Amino acid sequence: MEWTDSLILGILQGITEFLPVSSSGHLELGKAILGDNSMPEESMLFTVVLHFATALSTIVVFRKDIRDILTGFLKFKWNEDTQFISKIALSMLPAAVIGLFFEEELEQLFGGNIVLVGFMLIITGLLLFLADRAKNTNKKVSYIDAFVIGISQAI
């Protein structure tokens, strides 16, 4: 992969990560448009590095909020911060389990399969449209909600 392709994909990742769209799906489309012919393992490594960079930049931007939440969590008392971190951890479980046990199958299924990636982006768009039209109850996220969010993210 040329450095210019890497730069373009890095910019694409940076723009789409914080939008309610699949940045991973857009990366796959971007790789296809740029004619990326790298091996699946190299492609996956590149995607992981981009996501790591995004996570690192997010930590830098939200460092004060993260510090406050961690400070509350480290008091070892059941409070709003410990509940928040518990819900985040619970929401990560489905993706972690699927990623650990089905990594190769997922890479074969989605890696370079632009038609499937495009179809999944359309499905995601429809779900976001329906969620936007749903009645807003302003309720707090429950543990069940956190788990369902994790399943949705894993899919």
Range-by-range predicted roles:
Residues M1-I155:
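Multi-pass membrane proteins that catalyze or facilitate reactions on polyprenyl-/lipid-phosphate substrates
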